[in-house]
Amino acid sequence: LTARAYFDGADAAESKLRADITALWEAVEWDFFTKEGTEKVLYWHWSPDKGSAMNMPIQGWNEALIVYVLAASSPTHPIGREVYAEGWARGGAMRNGKSFYDTVLPLGEDYGGPLFWTHYSFLGLNPRGLSDAYADYWEQVCNHTRINYAYCVDNPKGYAGYGADCWGLTPSDIPDGYTASSPTNDRGVIAPTAALSSMPYTPDESMAALRFFYYKLGDKLWSDYGFIDSFDLTSGWFDRGMHIAI
């Protein structure tokens, strides 16, 4: 849809591109993913042979706001207001409202959860000036990021390296597998994507992390494909060979 708006020329190539994008956009049956209108929530999965057997509802607060925005704005298969209110917002239960490190968190779990929740929807949706009955989303993403940063600076578990220039908890590889790191699930592993993808929200803090990652950790963290996925300075583990494209 971003490309559809950008390529606005009258020539045949751009006109065809817009037509193809429009066809794809209008073909998505968002309302089907409410179990064909029987429930007031969208579901993550459906397949021709297993149907909705995975039975996983999409509910906030997390990275999936963009799904509900696209579904609500569909010109052909929109969801109703009640699906957004009861499904995504859980009837208001996605609100938080408590303070962590002197910062109010409008939505989500305590301490905000993993930082990718502030990133994915807003690759294509501007949170500035975006609000609904539940939150101002610019306040949400900025405060979530500030809490994640403050937690790493506080470093209550005493992990090596954590601080004002080395921070950011989000899903990544860890030495013994994979986990969704957050202040409530802290395994001592920093993921560069967490701080760097938060540049619009915490420009000074994110730039400090960028300088540390690049100039201080250098080749331990940087490769031909950019920064590696994650690292643990307590054990000296670096996830060499693994990258994530965000």
Which residues make up each language-model segment?
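Ser/Thr/Asn(+Pro)-rich, low-complexity disordered segments
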Residues: 1-245
